[in-house]
Amino acid sequence: MTKLSVNINKVATLRNARGGDTPNVVKVALDCEAFGADGITVHPRPDERHIRRADVYDLRPLLRTEFNIEGYPSPEFIDLVLKVKPHQVTLVPDDPSQITSNSGWDTKANLEFLSEVLDQFNSAGIRTSVFVAADPEMVEYAAKAGADRVELYTEPYATAYPKNPEAAVAPFVEAAKTARKLGIGLNAGHDLSLVNLNYFYKNIPWVDEVSIGHALISDALYLGLERTIQEYKNCLR
């Protein structure tokens, strides 16, 4: 079964826009779980413009589903993850100033660096995932670095999907087959939505997890959070 992890960064962005604690990030996360989410994802950035370090500590003891922390592996990020010990850590190659993740790792060029970082998390018993483009070579080098999983960066799929779904998903199928052949797990995320998720799933039904935030929270403005989560879960059947 493919798991749905809800990225709650946008909830934190809304809270931070006015100060105070509305909406309450922890309550929204717990409600997401109650409404059927299989996990919660956060991406704490150095400037704390959405998720704050304090949020990460507040969430960890209360969540009943999988907790996934994603981010660039700076010393501060590594320290946070090792202290909090989430179920999964996802490494992304973001510059701190980026609005959102917009590329995967060059796992070949960064093999030594990633290997050293992944070893720290693996030794702590934290499942590891590396954010990569739909390129079999990048998947192969992520496996060589010691990643338990890769997360496929799906923005190119989402962009190309409206014009030619078959062509859009083709490179992702090949990358997914490579991961399966190598025996590592497979996640996917970025710009997946109610429009394109089911087609992606039908072509790659062995994907372990999808992480969705912006589209899901946007849909919830119209449909409500509970119905929205159920709609996304329906896309994974």
Curated annotation (Swiss-Prot):
The record marks E151 as: Transition state stabilizer. It is found in: Cytoplasm. 1-deoxy-D-xylulose 5-phosphate binds at R45, H50, T100. It is an enzyme of class 2 (transferase). The active site is at H43 (proton acceptor), E70 (proton acceptor), H190 (proton donor). One of its GO terms (biological process) is pyridoxine biosynthetic process. 3-amino-2-oxopropyl phosphate binds at N7, R18, D191, G213, H214. Keywords: Cytoplasm, Pyridoxine biosynthesis, Transferase. GO terms for cellular component: cytosol. Its EC number is 2.6.99.2. GO terms for molecular function: pyridoxine 5'-phosphate synthase activity. It catalyses: 3-amino-2-oxopropyl phosphate + 1-deoxy-D-xylulose 5-phosphate = pyridoxine 5'-phosphate + phosphate + 2 H2O + H(+). Catalyzes the complicated ring closure reaction between the two acyclic compounds 1-deoxy-D-xylulose-5-phosphate (DXP) and 3-amino-2-oxopropyl phosphate (1-amino-acetone-3-phosphate or AAP) to form pyridoxine 5'-phosphate (PNP) and inorganic phosphate. HAMAP family: PdxJ (MF_00279). Belongs to the PNP synthase family. This is Pyridoxine 5'-phosphate synthase. The lineage of its organism: Bacteria, Pseudomonadati, Bacteroidota, Bacteroidia, Bacteroidales.
